[in-house]
Amino acid sequence: MAELTTLARPYAKAAFEHAQAHQQLANWSAMLGLAAAVSQDDTMQRLLKAPRLTSAEKAATFIDVCGDKFNAQAQNFIHVAAENDRLLLLPEIAALFDLYKAEQEKSVDVEVTSAFALNQEQQDKLAKVLSARLGQEVRLHASEDASLIGGVVIRAGDLVIDGSVRGKIAKLAEALKS
């Protein structure tokens, strides 16, 4: 995974800098999101891995599938990625682009996993507290996992806060083993 990120980073950075310079961050985010989804299709993956096709043929087919959703610069980006055999990295490129975009917009996506469903009031309160702690606008994404037993696990970028009962039991078990 780290290797994929290393390979994808220059492409994501170049796309981000171009989009930022032309004030098209949202447009490029949408185009890269579409490209990532298309590249994950099983049929498209087989095509992209086919050794008998040239990079130009792969790029042309990829662009044809996406239709008129790509502007000329995005089509050029796909051609460059194809020439360097990086079309399969599009999901990672799109994820990094969105990370750069979120940093630029001073916002962060926060994944909150709880043992039980959080109501809207709880989500709003949690988002407000996290926004104050992180100093950024928080976009909260809530999910449930009954195996947590109780509590929540919060993931915001590299930050992980494990306030789950399962996590506390695991820490206790580790302490008892020591």
UniProtKB/Swiss-Prot annotation:
Organism domain of life: Bacteria
Principal location class: membrane
Topology with respect to the bilayer: Peripheral membrane protein
Coiled coil feature spans: none
Subcellular localization(s) per the UniProt record: Cell inner membrane
GO cellular component: plasma membrane; proton-transporting ATP synthase complex
Annotated keywords: ATP synthesis, Cell inner membrane, Cell membrane, CF(1), Hydrogen ion transport, Ion transport, Membrane, Transport
Family to which this protein belongs: Belongs to the ATPase delta chain family.
Quaternary structure and interacting proteins, as annotated: F-type ATPases have 2 components, F(1) - the catalytic core - and F(0) - the membrane proton channel. F(1) has five subunits: alpha(3), beta(3), gamma(1), delta(1), epsilon(1). F(0) has three main subunits: a(1), b(2) and c(10-14). The alpha and beta chains form an alternating ring which encloses part of the gamma chain. F(1) is attached to F(0) by a central stalk formed by the gamma and epsilon chains, while a peripheral stalk is formed by the delta and b chains.
Role of this protein: F(1)F(0) ATP synthase produces ATP from ADP in the presence of a proton or sodium gradient. F-type ATPases consist of two structural domains, F(1) containing the extramembraneous catalytic core and F(0) containing the membrane proton channel, linked together by a central stalk and a peripheral stalk. During catalysis, ATP synthesis in the catalytic domain of F(1) is coupled via a rotary mechanism of the central stalk subunits to proton translocation. This protein is part of the stalk that links CF(0) to CF(1). It either transmits conformational changes from CF(0) to CF(1) or is implicated in proton conduction.
Protein name in UniProt: ATP synthase subunit delta
